[in-house]
C-alpha cells in the first residue's frame, strides 16, 4: 500500500501535517510506502491526480480503490491506514 501526500510550502495545514505523516511513515515503514509531492514543483502530476485543494492525501491499497482525504486529521489518517490499507 502507498500513501501520497500532496503539499506546498505556503500551505499552513500542509506544513503542520508533515511531521505527523513522518511519524506515521516511521511507524508503518515495513508495511506502507509514504510519498510526498510538492504541488508547486509537480504541477503536471497534480493535474493528473486532479488536486484541487491542499493538503490532499491519497491512500492506495494493494487491491481496491484509492481513498482521497482533503484536510482530515492525523487520527483519521491512522484509522484509514489501519482499517483500509492494513485491514487490522
Listing of model-derived features with the role each one plays in the protein:
Residues 1-9:
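Short active-site neighborhood of thiol/selenol oxidoreductases, capturing the structured segment around
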Residues 11-14:
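Hydrophobic heptad-repeat coiled-coil signature
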Amino acid at each position: 500500500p502507498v500513501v501520497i501526500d500532496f503539499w506546498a510550502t505556503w500551505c499552513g495545514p500542509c506544513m503542520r501535517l508533515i511531521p505527523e505523516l513522518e511519524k506515521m511513515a516511521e511507524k508503518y515503514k515495513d508495511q506502507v510506502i509514504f510519498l510526498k509531492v510538492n504541488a508547486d514543483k509537480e504541477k503536471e502530476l497534480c493535474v493528473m491526480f486532479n488536486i484541487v485543494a491542499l493538503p490532499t492525501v491519497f491512500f492506495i491499497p494493494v487491491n481496491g480503490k484509492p481513498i482521497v482525504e482533503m484536510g482530515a486529521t492525523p487520527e483519521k489518517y491512522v484509522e484509514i491506514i489501519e482499517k483500509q490499507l492494513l485491514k487490522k
